[in-house]
């Protein structure tokens, strides 16, 4: 959400841009009331797209979702259906998927007023050849790309989208099983519909071009742009006072390594957990003063890892898990961290790595996906499967001040942080040229 929010805030400052939303019930784009834009961007208003089932002409994929949800309520039946499709899932993996989806539905939402779509729109947009629709979010959730394709043929407008990554195509093992086919269909449709795509890294852009070539899809015009690394809350940016952030009590007076990410298989928390507990068990880190901090909600297929961390006395004492924190609290965690960690198996960008470097911190990272593009020569790279290597590097960064400060000085001397203002300027300028 951060990318969409930051770009939208800056788009609101331009007289050449307006805000719209796709109404799936009426299969058209509608203009958002200018009076509602600021409250929406500030999180004061949450727009509800819910409609009675008889009013919603759902795209074909929704019927697949309904059928899957019905079968998923019966794990052994779901397991049998997947085996027929040539895919094998254990009952534990199926339970993880059910838990992940239940947590996603019940996750705390920002404190805001929920209003129906009809209350924030002021009519259909008059589409023509001079119109460009820019989609900054995930089209598969609330849009019908096939219907948008038909609209394009009638009205001649252009359609641009942000591409974050192609994980479902490249590493489907790291995607919630029920979403794999849906997202593969989504990308196939998106690249036919979109006239231009802005990718969040050159790595993602290369992946997109390879995908289009592989499947014989005419590649849309494309470019890449970097993401901003300044953590600025909506309240702070608007000048509104916000409560001062404080470190969690369990981190007061501690030194800690920080990993900001949803806990899920692709992010590779297990390697850090094993590397960390190994160092603790061997007495190379001090349980009285050293902490490993995970910031992010628990995702899918990590039930065993969470259970293991909860049961492990070393992890109970020295690994801190945080979620649903504010931007101000995240900013404070970055400022006080000794080092940043990013062992992911694949990233479309790796925003937390950029944010950590923006705070001048020493970082350990894998080279996967776009991470080397973000980190350059300012980061120490370790294979994501090298548990021993991660353990030794973490110990060295805590215990060898010379090694850690050497990285910090290199970051301070040569790193050029990208602000969200600069990222937005590049995004809109490069998109204009496509």
Model-derived features: positions:
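Carbohydrate transferase catalytic cores enriched for Leloir-type hexosyltransferases
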Residues: 1-434
């Amino acid at each position: 959400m951060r990318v969409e929010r930051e770009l939208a805030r800056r788009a609101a400052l331009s007289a050449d841009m307006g805000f719209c939303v796709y109404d799936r019930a009426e299969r058209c784009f509608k203009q958002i009331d200018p009076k509602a834009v600021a409250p929406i961007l500030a999180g004061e208003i949450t727009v509800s797209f819910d409609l009675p089932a008889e009013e919603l002409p759902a795209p074909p994929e929704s019927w697949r979702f309904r059928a899957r949800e019905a079968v998923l309520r019966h794990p052994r039946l779901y397991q049998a259906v997947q085996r027929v499709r040539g895919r094998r899932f254990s009952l534990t993996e199926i339970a993880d998927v059910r838990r992940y989806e239940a947590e996603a539905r019940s996750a705390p939402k920002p404190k805001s007023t929920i209003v129906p779509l009809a209350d924030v729109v002021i009519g259909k947009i008059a589409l023509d050849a001079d119109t460009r629709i820019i989609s900054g979010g995930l089209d598969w959730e609330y849009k019908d790309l096939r219907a948008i394709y038909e609209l394009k043929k009638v009205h001649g407008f252009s359609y641009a989208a942000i591409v974050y990554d192609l994980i479902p195509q490249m590493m489907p093992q790291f995607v919630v099983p029920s979403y794999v086919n849906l997202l593969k269909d989504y990308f196939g449709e998106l690249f036919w519909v979109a006239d231009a795509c802005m990718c969040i890294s050159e790595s993602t852009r290369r992946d997109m071009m390879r995908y289009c070539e592989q499947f014989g899809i005419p590649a849309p015009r494309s470019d890449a742009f970097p993401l901003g690394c300044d953590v600025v809350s909506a309240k702070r940016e608007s000048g509104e006072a916000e409560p001062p952030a404080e470190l969690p009590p369990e981190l007061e007076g501690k030194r800690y390594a920080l990993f900001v990410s949803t806990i899920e298989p692709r992010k590779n928390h297990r390697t850090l957990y094993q590397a960390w507990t190994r160092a603790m068990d061997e007495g190379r880190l001090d349980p009285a003063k050293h902490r490993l901090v995970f910031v992010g909600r628990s995702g899918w297929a990590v039930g065993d890892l969470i259970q293991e961390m909860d049961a492990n006395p070393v992890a109970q004492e020295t690994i801190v898990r945080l979620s649903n924190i504010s931007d101000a609290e995240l900013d404070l965690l970055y400022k006080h961290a000794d080092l940043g960690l990013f062992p992911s198996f694949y990233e479309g960008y790796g925003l937390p790595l950029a944010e950590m470097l923006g705070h001048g911190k020493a970082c350990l990272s894998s080279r996967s996906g776009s991470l080397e593009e973000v980190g350059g020569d300012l980061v120490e790279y370790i294979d994501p499967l090298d548990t021993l290597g991660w353990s030794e590097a973490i110990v060295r960064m805590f215990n060898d001040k010379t090694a850690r400060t050497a990285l910090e000085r290199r970051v301070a001397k040569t790193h050029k942080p990208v602000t969200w203002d600069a990222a937005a300027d590049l995004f809109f300028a490069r998109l204009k040229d496509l």
